[in-house]
Each structure stands twice: as structure tokens, then as C-alpha cells.
Amino acid sequence: MSNDTFYLKREKRFLVLLGIICLSLIGGALYMQIALGEAPCPLCILQRYALLFIAIFAFIGAAMNGRRGVTVFEALVTLSALCGIAAAGRHAWILAHPSDSCGIDILQPIVDGLPLATLFPTGFQVSGFCTTPYPPVLGLSLAQWALTAFVLTAILVPACIIRNRRKPY
């Protein structure tokens, strides 16, 4: 096996793992919504979209042949993670400053107008407020956990690209 094949396979395995983790996080959010009754706010839904796009781009990238195709989808994964950072960062800031709201009246119609809100309303339709504090998980709010996941993705995926492109082929 050549070095090119080895590093490309390792990168593809990483993308598949990332996609599975993102889908698991969406599943966890749905569990908390349905089983625990924690209603999602507009920023929660935007974070779900970011996770979904990361998973989709990661799976497509893992299925691509050749370095260039994989790199394009890794760039899309990184872009989706940056969008997730914006949504989760704003949500974490709102939770830290409850006097400010995410503006459910402003964001709700926009988020509810997105295609998945009509196709899968249970998972992608707004039903809560961004200022609602839910019990922390291991000391962090859900928004802080999401922010951590998005930041790690935005750092690790480009690091993987850079590391594997420096290898001699």
C-alpha cells in the first residue's frame, strides 16, 4: 500500500467517524427533546442543521475517490463547523446573559421555514426559547457542549488536511 493510499484511507475513516458522531449528537438532542421534554429553540435547530451538514459532507467526502474530492468536502465540513460555532457561541452567550434573547419572534419563522422543518417537524421545528436553562451535563450547558464539538471539528479537520498533505506521496 502506498503512502497516498494509507493517508487517504485514514482520512476517510476519520470522516466516517465524524459523520457518525454528528448523527449521534442529533440523536441525543432528539432524545432530550422527546423523552426529557426539552424544547429546542431557534439556535438549537440551527446547531442541528450544522451537525447534519457536517455529517452529510463527511460521508460524501469519505465516499470520494482521490485527494481533491476528499479535500473539497473536508472544506465544506469545516465551513459547516464554523456556522455551528456561530450558532452555538451565540446560544452560549445568551445563556450566560439571560437578559438578551435570541429573538424567537425573529428567528422562529425563518428556521421553521427551512425545508426540514416541514419534512421532519419533530426534529427541526422551533418550540422553545433560547434563554431556557436546562440542567448542565458534566458541568456544561448543551450549547457549550455543542460549541466544543464545533470548535474541535473546525480545528481537527483542517489539521488533518494539512498533516496528510505534508506527507510525501
From Swiss-Prot:
SUPFAM superfamilies: DsbB-like. Keywords: Cell inner membrane, Cell membrane, Chaperone, Disulfide bond, Electron transport, Membrane, Oxidoreductase, Redox-active center, Transmembrane, Transmembrane helix, Transport. It is found in: Cell inner membrane. It comes from the Bacteria. InterPro entries: DiS_bond_form_DsbB/BdbC, Disulphide_bond_form_DsbB, DsbB, DsbB-like_sf. GO terms for molecular function: electron transfer activity; protein-disulfide reductase activity. It is a multi-pass membrane protein. The keyword Transport applies. GO terms for biological process: protein folding. GO terms for cellular component: plasma membrane. Residues 32-49, 90-144 are periplasmic. Pfam families: DsbB. Disulfide bonds join 41-44, 102-130. The keyword Cell inner membrane applies. The chain crosses the membrane at residues 15-31, 50-64, 72-89, 145-163. Residues 1-14, 65-71, 164-169 are cytoplasmic. Required for disulfide bond formation in some periplasmic proteins. Acts by oxidizing the DsbA protein. Belongs to the DsbB family. This is Disulfide bond formation protein B. It comes from Pseudomonas syringae pv. tomato (strain ATCC BAA-871 / DC3000). The gene is dsbB.
